[in-house]
A protein has these predicted regions:
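Conserved CoA-thioester-binding segment of acyl-CoA-metabolizing enzymes
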Residues: 1-57, 92
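Conserved phosphate-binding and hydrolysis motifs of nucleotide-dependent enzymes
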Residues: 20, 26-29, 56-58, 64-66, ...
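Hydrophobic alpha-helical membrane-association signature
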Residues: 32-35, 83-86, 116, 189, ...
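Glycine- (often His-adjacent) and acidic-residue-rich active-site loop
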Residues: 56-93, 109, 139, 222
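Crotonase-fold acyl-CoA enzyme core
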Residues: 92-208, 231, 235, 239-240, ...
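Short, charged, surface-exposed hinge/linker loops at domain edges
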Residues: 212-221
């Protein structure tokens, strides 16, 4: 399927989605938002794809909302809600996507651009990456899940500081506060991310989907509910062909060949 604002590449079980508006630092216009949702729908149906990498073209991840389109005319409250709900559908889809997702961040990831990175399961950043909840600078509030996602990574107090000051932080600070998983030199960003994605893609797809769902759910339920979820997940995993293959491979001292069944 062709997209106007997105490049999609699939190799060795890894689908790379590249936001492709480099002239606008990959600002999230309506076309980009539509393309992102459609791409996830397409990739979910592809059994050969096991991991998704989300990134941006031209040396930046995403500058967030398209400020130029905002400046073109004043939007009504109803129009504003419609635009945000389109973004929110993508972030919710991304967070709950059954396949593992990795944000590969170079350059700016600010505003909604920061929040779609936070919606991924992991963030690998280059040493020149910048992150920020900057919407207060233009009289707006965080959207795209920023109020929910950010505090779960960095804590409520730090999240409030980032939002209310609209400060942009560098990659080293993002790593220090737990916003990102790893920071690597820019020249190593793609290789590092692909190595991580490849390692995950080589694992059991069914168990990965179940484990991701359990971890997401556990963040908002008590221990008893989390334990019940684990019992349900394990009852599905233990009866799978992948589990049998994993046990055989362990006993035979070889690499397993998981099929997602």
């Amino acid at each position: 399927m062709g997209y106007k604002a997105l490049l999609v590449d699939r190799v060795d079980g890894i689908a790379t989605l590249t936001m492709n508006r480099p002239e606008a630092r990959n600002a999230l216009d309506i076309q980009m938002r539509e393309d992102l949702v459609s791409a996830l729908d397409e990739i979910e149906r592809d059994p050969a794809t096991r991991v998704v990498v989300l990134t941006g073209a031209g040396g930046h991840f995403s500058a967030g909302g398209d400020v130029k389109s905002m400046a073109a005319r004043r939007h009504s409250a109803a129009e504003g809600r419609e635009r945000v709900e389109m973004l929110n559908r993508f972030v919710l889809r991304l967070f709950n996507f059954p396949k593992p997702t990795i944000a590969m961040v170079d350059g700016f990831a600010v505003g909604a651009g920061c929040n779609i990175a936070l919606g991924c399961d992991m963030i690998i950043a280059s040493d020149r990456a910048k992150f920020g909840e900057v919407l207060l600078k233009i009289g707006l509030v965080p959207d795209g899940g920023g109020t929910w996602l950010l505090q779960r990574l960095v804590g409520l107090a730090k999240a409030k500081e980032m939002v209310l000051t609209a400060e942009i932080i560098d990659a080293a600070e993002a790593l220090r506060i737990g916003l990102v998983n790893r920071v690597v030199p820019a020249v190593e960003l793609e290789a590092t991310t692909r190595a991580l994605a490849g390692r995950i893609a080589a694992g059991p797809p069914l168990a990965a989907t179940l484990a991701k769902s359990l971890l997401n759910r556990a963040a908002t339920v008590d221990l008893a509910a989390a334990l019940e979820g684990e019992a349900f997940g394990q009852s599905n995993a233990i009866s799978s062909e992948d589990h049998a293959e994993g046990v055989r491979a362990f006993l035979e001292k070889r690499a397993p060949k998981f099929q997602g069944r």
